[in-house]
Amino acid sequence: MSELAMRSVVIIGAGPVGCALATLLRRQGLAVDLFERQTESAGTGSGHSFNLTLTSRGLDCLPLSVRRRLYLQGSVLAKRIIHHRDGAISTQAYGTLYNHHLLSIPRGILQDLLRDQALRAGARIHYGQECIDVDTARASALLQDRDGSSTWVSGDLLVGCDGANSAVRDAIVAAHPADMRMTRDTIAHGYAEITMDYGDADPTGMHLWPRGDHFLQAQPNRDQTFTTSLFKPTAGDDAQRHFSGLPSASAISRYCATEFPDVFGRMAEVGNELASRSPGYLRIINTAPYHHRRAVLVGDAAHAVVPFYGQGINCSFEDAATLASLLEKFQAAVRSEGGTVKTVAEVVVDEYSDVRVKAGHALAELSMRNLEELSDHVNSPLFLERKALERRLHELRPDLYTPLYQLVAFTHMPYDAVQRVQQESSAVLDSLCEGRDVRAEQDAIIGEFAELYRGTTQLTPSKVQTG
């Protein structure tokens, strides 16, 4: 093996993110082997059927050929469609430009496309291989097959891309607790999947039924079906507002008929469906740092977030693109200035971790904050007035202000920078709006905001480099 060039990468986990990373690394001429715990026939599902929502932040990290194929099989959603308690329906656009939309796609379709792309690029996928230990100094993983036989595999770099229940991460934390810290928190809300007939639904938006601390969400698919999920607390004092307070099929049916009367007729089996299985739990996993020696974590293995921003997969693809970019940069430097494979691997993962840990932690906080918006705020007239003000401010002064959702979903500004910018601008708008009729005084508030920033330039997406 040449000491001046990295030649091989071992990836544990052959899900969408692992396959995307493999394709990027193969473009650099690296030998890439992916080892997947599941058998090939079982696939690499995550255990739930949420559609994955891709935005330009994540899509831009994928090859153009993959993006084209995804658009042929996914659903373009340009707005929220809000179903209010009184039967009224309102819409909220996700952004202001043609590419300000979500691409909603079933996980299985995304998985198949990215796996095929990785194989065409020359990556090798080995199924039925469970990671049971790692050696970060040697970039090695101990794998066990279905017969119980085990063997070590090694590369110049070891990547843990094996999801929220990452064996790579857990092995590193167990062996080096002082060097890698991990927290795992289960939030109060859980989820349950519901079968709901499509009917005459608008296929161009994400359908939401916000009901305080609980809400129903339905994502249209191209085959005129819905991927539908109910989110609500798992337990609490008010029985009707929590999963634990719905002990029978009849109680569930009464709840849905009361809360979602406009679509209850499309939920023929909702009572039996929810009574026959427990709700799923939602967890937040934060890790710091994302690396140890010559091993590095990518995607949910490093940072599992709740699905309320739909940014988990986008953040994970950014991880992959960032790691691949840093590898390319440092390999070029080594070839021109000298160094070793070990130097490249350890420098790359250190810089990657420095950038991506801050972004991952910020997204976890932003995702929890968006739960309040989805379940309650979208119903509030005051919230809608504020959103209208922010949208108008952006239209008039895009150099000074961009709404939070657009920064999160449709730019490459790091999530932690988004958080800082939004906290500053929100504080200013809060002070300007206090005690005023926001709708009637919209123009005056915008003028005062612009005056405060006269002669300055607020941090905007074009001025911040992505990690």
What is each model feature region?
Residues 38, 164, 301-302:
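Conserved Walker B
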Residues 14-27, 159-160, 194, 276-369, ...:
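Conserved mid-domain beta->alpha element of the FAD-binding
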Residues 116, 132-133, 138-282, 286-287, ...:
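Conserved FAD-binding catalytic core of PHBH/FMO-like flavoproteins
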Residues 17, 40, 165:
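Conserved Rossmann-like nucleotide-cofactor binding loop
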Residues 26-47:
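Glycine-rich FAD pyrophosphate-binding loop
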